[in-house]
Amino acid sequence: MSESISVIREKLSHVISEQDAFFQLCLQDERKGVIKLIESTRKKLEKEAQLIAKLAEMKQYETNLSTQGFQYIAGVDEVGRGPLAGPVVAAAVILPADFSLLGINDSKQLSEAKRDMLFEIIKKEALSIGVGIIEHDMIDQVNIYEATKLAMSEALDQLNPAPDFILVDAMPLKYSESELSLIKGDTKSISIAAASIIAKVTRDRMMQHYDALYPGYDFANNMGYGTKKHLNGLDTIGVCPIHRLSFSPVKEAKLHFESLK
Protein backbone atom coordinates (compact mmCIF):
# COMPACT_ATOMS: atom_id res chain seq x y z
CA MET A 1 0.00 0.00 0.00
CA SER A 2 1.42 3.37 -1.03
CA GLU A 3 -0.69 5.73 1.11
CA SER A 4 0.96 7.60 3.97
CA ILE A 5 0.13 6.83 7.59
CA SER A 6 -1.81 10.10 7.91
CA VAL A 7 -3.96 9.28 4.87
CA ILE A 8 -4.64 5.78 6.20
CA ARG A 9 -5.57 7.22 9.60
CA GLU A 10 -8.10 9.53 7.95
CA LYS A 11 -9.64 6.74 5.87
CA LEU A 12 -9.83 4.33 8.82
CA SER A 13 -11.70 6.97 10.85
CA HIS A 14 -14.66 6.46 8.47
CA VAL A 15 -14.63 2.65 8.58
CA ILE A 16 -17.73 1.18 10.25
CA SER A 17 -16.93 -2.53 9.98
CA GLU A 18 -13.93 -4.83 9.97
CA GLN A 19 -15.37 -6.26 6.75
CA ASP A 20 -14.74 -2.92 5.03
CA ALA A 21 -12.54 -3.42 1.96
CA PHE A 22 -10.07 -0.74 3.01
CA PHE A 23 -9.75 -2.22 6.52
CA GLN A 24 -9.04 -5.62 4.99
CA LEU A 25 -6.45 -4.08 2.70
CA CYS A 26 -4.72 -2.44 5.66
CA LEU A 27 -4.34 -5.85 7.31
CA GLN A 28 -1.78 -6.68 4.65
CA ASP A 29 0.34 -3.60 5.47
CA GLU A 30 3.26 -4.56 7.72
CA ARG A 31 4.28 -1.03 8.73
CA LYS A 32 4.22 -0.58 12.52
CA GLY A 33 2.23 2.64 12.21
CA VAL A 34 -0.48 0.90 10.20
CA ILE A 35 -0.58 -2.06 12.60
CA LYS A 36 -1.17 0.38 15.48
CA LEU A 37 -3.92 2.11 13.51
CA ILE A 38 -5.57 -1.25 12.84
CA GLU A 39 -5.49 -2.08 16.55
CA SER A 40 -6.99 1.27 17.58
CA THR A 41 -9.66 1.06 14.85
CA ARG A 42 -10.57 -2.46 15.96
CA LYS A 43 -10.97 -1.26 19.57
CA LYS A 44 -13.12 1.65 18.41
CA LEU A 45 -15.37 -0.66 16.39
CA GLU A 46 -15.68 -3.08 19.32
CA LYS A 47 -16.71 -0.22 21.62
CA GLU A 48 -19.26 1.03 19.11
CA ALA A 49 -20.69 -2.49 18.76
CA GLN A 50 -21.05 -2.69 22.55
CA LEU A 51 -22.82 0.68 22.63
CA ILE A 52 -25.20 -0.40 19.85
CA ALA A 53 -25.98 -3.64 21.70
CA LYS A 54 -26.53 -1.74 24.95
CA LEU A 55 -28.85 0.72 23.22
CA ALA A 56 -30.92 -2.13 21.76
CA GLU A 57 -31.12 -3.70 25.21
CA MET A 58 -32.24 -0.41 26.78
CA LYS A 59 -35.03 0.00 24.21
CA GLN A 60 -36.57 -3.44 24.81
CA TYR A 61 -39.21 -2.30 27.30
CA GLU A 62 -40.26 0.64 25.13
CA THR A 63 -40.32 -1.53 21.99
CA ASN A 64 -42.43 -4.22 23.66
CA LEU A 65 -44.87 -1.65 25.03
CA SER A 66 -45.17 0.00 21.62
CA THR A 67 -46.16 -3.33 20.06
CA GLN A 68 -48.92 -3.55 22.70
CA GLY A 69 -50.33 -0.23 21.50
CA PHE A 70 -48.85 2.20 24.02
CA GLN A 71 -47.81 5.42 22.32
CA TYR A 72 -46.59 7.78 25.04
CA ILE A 73 -44.25 5.87 27.35
CA ALA A 74 -42.78 7.96 30.15
CA GLY A 75 -39.59 7.12 32.01
CA VAL A 76 -39.32 8.51 35.55
CA ASP A 77 -36.28 8.82 37.80
CA GLU A 78 -35.06 10.93 40.70
CA VAL A 79 -31.83 12.24 42.13
CA GLY A 80 -31.07 13.60 45.57
CA ARG A 81 -32.52 11.16 48.07
CA GLY A 82 -29.28 10.79 50.03
CA PRO A 83 -27.84 14.32 50.34
CA LEU A 84 -27.91 16.32 53.57
CA ALA A 85 -28.88 19.51 51.74
CA GLY A 86 -30.90 20.71 48.79
CA PRO A 87 -34.00 19.37 47.05
CA VAL A 88 -34.93 15.99 45.68
CA VAL A 89 -35.48 16.32 41.92
CA ALA A 90 -37.42 13.97 39.67
CA ALA A 91 -37.82 14.02 35.91
CA ALA A 92 -40.30 12.35 33.58
CA VAL A 93 -39.46 11.99 29.90
CA ILE A 94 -41.41 10.76 26.88
CA LEU A 95 -39.13 9.96 23.95
CA PRO A 96 -40.05 9.45 20.29
CA ALA A 97 -40.36 5.79 19.33
CA ASP A 98 -37.40 6.10 16.96
CA PHE A 99 -35.15 7.87 19.49
CA SER A 100 -31.60 6.49 19.52
CA LEU A 101 -28.63 7.89 21.38
CA LEU A 102 -25.43 5.89 21.71
CA GLY A 103 -23.86 6.13 25.16
CA ILE A 104 -27.04 6.92 27.06
CA ASN A 105 -27.00 5.26 30.47
CA ASP A 106 -27.61 5.83 34.16
CA SER A 107 -26.56 9.45 34.77
CA LYS A 108 -24.30 8.45 37.66
CA GLN A 109 -22.13 6.41 35.28
CA LEU A 110 -21.51 9.33 32.93
CA SER A 111 -19.01 12.17 33.12
CA GLU A 112 -20.35 15.68 33.70
CA ALA A 113 -19.44 16.68 30.14
CA LYS A 114 -21.23 13.63 28.71
CA ARG A 115 -24.31 14.29 30.87
CA ASP A 116 -24.45 17.92 29.77
CA MET A 117 -24.22 16.91 26.10
CA LEU A 118 -26.94 14.26 26.43
CA PHE A 119 -29.08 16.68 28.48
CA GLU A 120 -29.22 19.12 25.56
CA ILE A 121 -30.00 16.37 23.03
CA ILE A 122 -32.79 14.93 25.19
CA LYS A 123 -34.29 18.40 25.76
CA LYS A 124 -34.29 19.01 22.01
CA GLU A 125 -35.68 15.65 20.87
CA ALA A 126 -38.02 14.47 23.66
CA LEU A 127 -41.76 14.65 23.02
CA SER A 128 -42.29 15.94 26.54
CA ILE A 129 -40.29 16.56 29.73
CA GLY A 130 -41.50 17.24 33.26
CA VAL A 131 -39.37 18.15 36.28
CA GLY A 132 -40.55 17.91 39.88
CA ILE A 133 -38.63 19.66 42.66
CA ILE A 134 -39.39 19.10 46.34
CA GLU A 135 -37.39 21.39 48.60
CA HIS A 136 -35.59 20.56 51.85
CA ASP A 137 -38.35 21.87 54.13
CA MET A 138 -41.00 19.60 52.57
CA ILE A 139 -38.57 16.68 52.81
CA ASP A 140 -38.33 17.38 56.54
CA GLN A 141 -42.12 17.46 56.81
CA VAL A 142 -43.06 14.29 54.95
CA ASN A 143 -39.78 12.22 54.88
CA ILE A 144 -37.55 11.61 51.88
CA TYR A 145 -39.48 8.60 50.53
CA GLU A 146 -42.78 10.49 50.34
CA ALA A 147 -40.99 13.59 49.02
CA THR A 148 -39.52 11.51 46.20
CA LYS A 149 -42.97 10.25 45.23
CA LEU A 150 -44.26 13.83 45.29
CA ALA A 151 -41.43 14.95 42.99
CA MET A 152 -42.14 12.11 40.57
CA SER A 153 -45.87 12.84 40.53
CA GLU A 154 -45.17 16.54 39.98
CA ALA A 155 -42.93 15.70 37.02
CA LEU A 156 -45.56 13.41 35.49
CA ASP A 157 -48.29 16.03 35.95
CA GLN A 158 -46.33 18.37 33.66
CA LEU A 159 -46.19 15.98 30.70
CA ASN A 160 -48.11 16.94 27.58
CA PRO A 161 -49.14 14.64 26.01
CA ALA A 162 -50.00 12.64 29.11
CA PRO A 163 -48.31 9.23 29.29
CA ASP A 164 -50.31 6.08 28.62
CA PHE A 165 -47.63 3.94 30.28
CA ILE A 166 -45.04 4.76 32.95
CA LEU A 167 -41.68 3.12 33.60
CA VAL A 168 -40.35 4.03 37.07
CA ASP A 169 -36.89 3.47 38.47
CA ALA A 170 -36.90 1.21 41.55
CA MET A 171 -39.89 2.44 43.55
CA PRO A 172 -43.59 1.68 42.98
CA LEU A 173 -45.24 5.04 42.39
CA LYS A 174 -48.89 4.01 41.93
CA TYR A 175 -49.49 7.06 39.76
CA SER A 176 -51.23 5.01 37.08
CA GLU A 177 -52.62 1.53 36.55
CA SER A 178 -50.35 1.28 33.49
CA GLU A 179 -47.06 1.39 35.34
CA LEU A 180 -43.98 -0.78 35.82
CA SER A 181 -41.27 -0.38 38.45
CA LEU A 182 -37.81 -1.57 37.36
CA ILE A 183 -34.93 -2.21 39.75
CA LYS A 184 -31.91 -0.37 38.31
CA GLY A 185 -34.26 0.89 35.64
CA ASP A 186 -31.85 3.64 34.62
CA THR A 187 -29.59 0.94 33.16
CA LYS A 188 -32.46 -1.03 31.55
CA SER A 189 -34.76 1.56 29.99
CA ILE A 190 -33.78 4.38 27.64
CA SER A 191 -36.69 6.49 28.91
CA ILE A 192 -35.67 6.11 32.56
CA ALA A 193 -32.03 6.77 31.64
CA ALA A 194 -33.09 9.98 29.88
CA ALA A 195 -35.08 11.01 32.96
CA SER A 196 -32.10 10.32 35.22
CA ILE A 197 -29.93 12.62 33.09
CA ILE A 198 -32.50 15.43 33.13
CA ALA A 199 -32.94 15.11 36.91
CA LYS A 200 -29.21 14.89 37.65
CA VAL A 201 -28.15 17.86 35.53
CA THR A 202 -31.04 19.97 36.83
CA ARG A 203 -30.18 19.27 40.47
CA ASP A 204 -26.42 19.60 39.99
CA ARG A 205 -26.88 23.07 38.51
CA MET A 206 -29.10 24.06 41.42
CA MET A 207 -26.46 22.91 43.90
CA GLN A 208 -23.73 24.80 42.03
CA HIS A 209 -25.88 27.93 42.39
CA TYR A 210 -26.38 27.23 46.10
CA ASP A 211 -22.61 26.87 46.50
CA ALA A 212 -22.25 30.55 45.59
CA LEU A 213 -25.01 31.52 48.03
CA TYR A 214 -23.80 29.34 50.90
CA PRO A 215 -20.02 28.89 50.66
CA GLY A 216 -18.13 26.67 53.05
CA TYR A 217 -19.86 23.35 52.35
CA ASP A 218 -18.42 22.58 48.88
CA PHE A 219 -21.91 22.11 47.41
CA ALA A 220 -20.59 22.62 43.86
CA ASN A 221 -18.60 19.39 44.14
CA ASN A 222 -20.49 17.21 46.63
CA MET A 223 -24.02 18.23 45.53
CA GLY A 224 -25.12 18.17 49.16
CA TYR A 225 -23.84 14.70 50.01
CA GLY A 226 -22.05 14.18 53.31
CA THR A 227 -18.44 14.44 52.18
CA LYS A 228 -15.58 15.38 54.51
CA LYS A 229 -15.62 19.03 53.36
CA HIS A 230 -19.38 19.21 53.83
CA LEU A 231 -19.20 17.73 57.33
CA ASN A 232 -16.34 20.10 58.19
CA GLY A 233 -18.57 22.96 57.08
CA LEU A 234 -21.35 21.76 59.37
CA ASP A 235 -18.88 21.56 62.26
CA THR A 236 -17.44 25.03 61.73
CA ILE A 237 -20.30 27.07 60.24
CA GLY A 238 -23.40 25.17 61.29
CA VAL A 239 -26.45 24.64 59.11
CA CYS A 240 -27.52 26.82 56.18
CA PRO A 241 -31.04 27.54 54.87
CA ILE A 242 -31.11 24.54 52.47
CA HIS A 243 -29.99 21.84 54.91
CA ARG A 244 -32.39 18.99 55.68
CA LEU A 245 -32.90 19.39 59.41
CA SER A 246 -34.39 15.91 59.82
CA PHE A 247 -31.19 14.29 58.54
CA SER A 248 -28.32 13.21 60.74
CA PRO A 249 -25.71 14.79 61.14
CA VAL A 250 -27.47 18.05 60.22
CA LYS A 251 -29.78 17.66 63.19
CA GLU A 252 -26.81 17.21 65.54
CA ALA A 253 -24.99 20.25 64.09
CA LYS A 254 -28.06 22.43 64.59
CA LEU A 255 -28.46 21.28 68.20
CA HIS A 256 -24.75 21.85 68.86
CA PHE A 257 -24.78 25.45 67.64
CA GLU A 258 -28.04 26.16 69.48
CA SER A 259 -26.44 24.93 72.71
CA LEU A 260 -23.63 27.48 72.29
CA LYS A 261 -26.01 30.44 72.29
UniProtKB/Swiss-Prot annotation:
GO terms of biological process kind: DNA replication, removal of RNA primer; mismatch repair
EC number(s) stated in the UniProt entry for this protein: 3.1.26.4
Cofactor: Mn(2+); Mg(2+)
Stored Gene3D superfamilies: Ribonuclease H-like superfamily/Ribonuclease H (3.30.420.10)
Molecular functions per Gene Ontology: manganese ion binding; RNA binding; RNA-DNA hybrid ribonuclease activity
Annotated SUPFAM superfamilies: Ribonuclease H-like
Binding site for a divalent metal cation: D77, E78, D169
Residue ranges of domain RNase H type-2 in the record: 71-259
Top-rank taxon, per record: Bacteria
Catalysed reaction equations from the record: Endonucleolytic cleavage to 5'-phosphomonoester
InterPro entries: RNase_HII (IPR022898), RNase_HII/HIII (IPR001352), RNase_HII/HIII_dom (IPR024567), RNaseH-like_sf (IPR012337), RNaseH_sf (IPR036397)
The entry's keywords: Cytoplasm, Endonuclease, Hydrolase, Manganese, Metal-binding, Nuclease
GO cellular component: cytoplasm; ribonuclease H2 complex
Cofactor note (record): Manganese or magnesium. Binds 1 divalent metal ion per monomer in the absence of substrate. May bind a second metal ion after substrate binding.
Localization, UniProt: Cytoplasm
Enzyme class: hydrolase
Record's function text: Endonuclease that specifically degrades the RNA of RNA-DNA hybrids.
Family from the record: Belongs to the RNase HII family.
Protein name: Ribonuclease HII
Organism: Listeria welshimeri serovar 6b (strain ATCC 35897 / DSM 20650 / CCUG 15529 / CIP 8149 / NCTC 11857 / SLCC 5334 / V8)
